[in-house]
Amino acid sequence: MGLEKSLILFPLLVLVLGWVQPSLARESPAMKFERQHMDSDGASSSSSTYCNQMMKRREMTKESCKPVNTFVHEPLADVQAVCSQENVTCKNGKQNCYKSTSALHITDCRLKDNSKYPNCDYKTSQYQKHIIVACEGNPYVPVHFDATV
């Protein structure tokens, strides 16, 4: 009797896991924000090759060259705290953007004019600027990097 139950339940388990697992592997908007914009230690951000290395490592040059990206060199908790700071209008007109109250250490990566995929070549520039992020969810966390000011 136990073997019969196992033979029935095992295929059901395989079906359920096959259905559930892909959704577990999907990257949430908050996880994507962290992958694309957070580099808390940022130890080598002063290197001229920082953007080339990080853009590749963080998978932003896989199918095309992402034209612009900003990395924030502050603790994740500090960037998440921006979601409770000054509410501002996003570039797309939505009202879920927030501006940091203090300037943060960032690295701006911009694709050079003569750069072509798959040889993505970026200009690396360091700044201390206020950031604007779009926030969503519960907990309310950054899901989109909107601008720097």
From Swiss-Prot:
Coiled coil: none annotated. Residues 1-25 form the signal peptide. The keyword Glycosyltransferase does not apply. Pfam families: RnaseA. CDD domains: RNase_A_canonical (cd06265). It catalyses: an [RNA] containing cytidine + H2O = an [RNA]-3'-cytidine-3'-phosphate + a 5'-hydroxy-ribonucleotide-3'-[RNA]; an [RNA] containing uridine + H2O = an [RNA]-3'-uridine-3'-phosphate + a 5'-hydroxy-ribonucleotide-3'-[RNA]. GO terms for molecular function: lyase activity; nucleic acid binding; ribonuclease A activity. It comes from the Eukaryota. Its EC number is 4.6.1.18. It is found in: Secreted. Belongs to the pancreatic ribonuclease family. This is Ribonuclease pancreatic. It comes from Uranomys ruddi.
